[in-house]
Design a protein with these regions (language model features):
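Perimembrane loop-to-helix junctions flanking transmembrane segments
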Residues: 48-70, 212-213
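Hydrophobic alpha-helical transmembrane segments of integral membrane proteins
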Residues: 103-136, 178-196
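N-terminal signal-anchor transmembrane alpha helix
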Residues: 14-47
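Interfacial helix-start motif at the membrane-water boundary
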Residues: 59-88
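Cytosolic juxtamembrane amphipathic/interface segments immediately preceding
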Residues: 3-21, 166-174
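Interfacial/capping segments of alpha-helical transmembrane domains
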Residues: 36-58, 204, 208
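Terminal transmembrane helical module of multi-pass membrane proteins
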Residues: 148-214
């Protein structure tokens, strides 16, 4: 009974704020597209220089000279947790709203640029390499970032209404409690994504590189 009630509340919440969630998704996709455009706007020299460093990285992976899995996990978890934490903090500040949107756009840009560069330099091989090295962890990370950004925007808008519209009667505290719980859940999911990035993706990447003779 409680589970069904929570599901109904969640569905009602998403319907109520569907326009914000849609805007956040579109903004992220715009970042991805812009990242791919940036790749196409690079000069041949810039692409060659960047691909040289990428080739060095490929060689390190094949030779097993990359960081230990535990170190990769710590780096990934710290990086993504900082990003999520920053978005969460910006959500409780009135002036943080535009920064949240900028950060999400940048995240999309990075993903679009990374995939776009691999495809532009290696074609189908680059796509397959991106599929095994970037996609697995981002199947968790991207939805978490999008959800956290949307909830931060919603909470920030509530703060603005509470501050500037005295007729706004909804209490902030219940929303803030849920906001904290959402952040905790996001961190748990980020830890799972970091585990995939540290222990699964490197093996998949090395296997794919051996298969593709990179």
């Amino acid at each position: 009974m409680k589970k069904r009630l929570y599901q109904n509340d969640a569905a009602s919440y998403f319907r109520e704020h569907s326009s914000i969630f849609l805007f956040i998704v579109i903004l992220f996709l715009m970042g991805v597209i812009f990242g791919a455009i940036v790749v196409n706007s690079m000069s041949i020299t810039q692409k060659e220089d960047l691909f040289y460093y990428l080739s060095q990285f490929f060689g390190q992976i094949l030779n097993g000279k990359v960081a230990e899995n535990n170190d990769l996990f710590a780096q990934s978890f710290l990086h993504n947790s900082k990003f999520i934490g920053l978005i969460w903090i910006l959500g409780i500040s009135i002036i943080g709203l535009p920064v949240i949107l900028i950060l999400l756009f940048i995240k999309g840009l990075v993903v679009g640029f990374t995939v776009g560069f691999l495809v532009s330099q290696l074609g189908l091989k680059g796509f397959l390499l991106a599929f095994v090295s970037i996609l697995p962890q981002n199947l968790i990370i991207i939805p978490v970032f999008i959800l956290m950004a949307a909830l931060s925007v919603i909470f920030s808008l509530r703060m603005i209404k509470k501050q500037f519209f005295k007729t706004y009667g909804q209490p902030i505290l219940p929303f803030f409690k849920n906001y904290i719980l959402t952040f905790v859940a996001a961190v748990v999911l980020i830890s799972a994504a970091s585990g995939v990035e540290a222990y699964v993706s490197p093996w998949l990447m090395k296997t794919m590189m051996g298969t593709l003779n990179l």
